[in-house]
């Protein structure tokens, strides 16, 4: 909508109308459910909506090797004016699209390559990276896709110039280990602010991430802060914990058995579980061309359906994995929204338990009992519907075929991580993980080689942490040590050779970064730094901490803070 106080020439007004018409026409071809820019003036619109045909043309022209570059570009003036100008110029002889972009946008700066001081140990390198990866965005440009946050925060690194939801918890583990409790508190405050502002924590603090969330680790973040601040942290963030829970459970009251609404599903027996969901069904701005190509490769499916499933996989954090596909070699067979993920439901169980604890800390016994009952119901649903009795591991539920899926993934360890697994089942999961996923360099994400980054042979720091902690929770200390030791050795060998930590690792050996996926391997790297530092302190005694991974395997892991076990673990 053009502000009334701005006076423009008749010609320019006509051009703007043309531009807007083109924008609406462009997006009608992608989805009828795309957000209406005028429906909520408080919610900033992503660049694909702000710029319409210009955004589409720039991305399709592949002006930049990484599609995220233009998604992060900042318009130098009102996008409507730029769009109108583009509509007038683009058919003129000699029009240069790249020149037009350079004149009208500020492109993101290439990250300065961090050169660490020579001779640093692994610990020294990580401690030195915290200030390098710290950002502050209290004030941003008016049309920037970056969303402002009140406090400073730590980014993952590389192409990821913003904060990411689930990444941040594992980064915060390292910050706490380094004694940076002020930064931990700042990041929890930022996520609380986002919940208050948007009703949920978006995938990242970009406008184009607002339509989805990510694995809900906010409860873990608050629990981490409570280790330092006590129950005051639980009481302070109880309202935000409740709001996040409301976001994930929106629409549950009206669901009939067999129905789904956004992020919540009700199975035929009345069990309530959750799935990943994105509110939009258009190509992702940060992967525009790739998503369009994926949809075109499978003309038998509606493009909007594929776009939604791609976006929902991004919400899962596992973008992409054979876990979500019918054919692991064909991304267009992805159907994330028809799969009930075991890890998501384990995390929501943890959220319910944290809500119960926070309510009790606030003196509300009735609410504490209410959330405990919800957690118990979810735990029963996990045991009933997300356990593959034939294979002997936790797995995802297939809504389309109304049955448990057979694939073993590292997500099977999440019920152990949140203490929601039965003891006998935890032992079976440990045996399965050791037999099928444990590799020389750590725990593989799956056993499938699809070329996607959340598949074999890649291993990711957060999944190593979840597995090791979950196994320890159930007395599977030897397997937990193997996961920890092998992954740390992989990180150390890679660091020794390249003097950096990376986003993911090839766990089929040691000393090699991972591959696959939509973009090159990224350096930094927030969650790897955090998990590595935490694991270093677990394999070395407190009285004699180690700065690098020891050359010989320790006998056992150091003790970690005890989590309250659920009834299932007794």
Swiss-Prot record:
Residues 1-34 form the signal peptide. One of its GO terms (molecular function) is alpha,alpha-trehalase activity. Substrate binds at residues 159, 166-167, 203, 212-214, 284-286, 317, 518. It catalyses: alpha,alpha-trehalose + H2O = alpha-D-glucose + beta-D-glucose. Pfam families: Trehalase. It is found in: Periplasm. Belongs to the glycosyl hydrolase 37 family. This is Periplasmic trehalase. It comes from Salmonella paratyphi B (strain ATCC BAA-1250 / SPB7). The gene is treA.
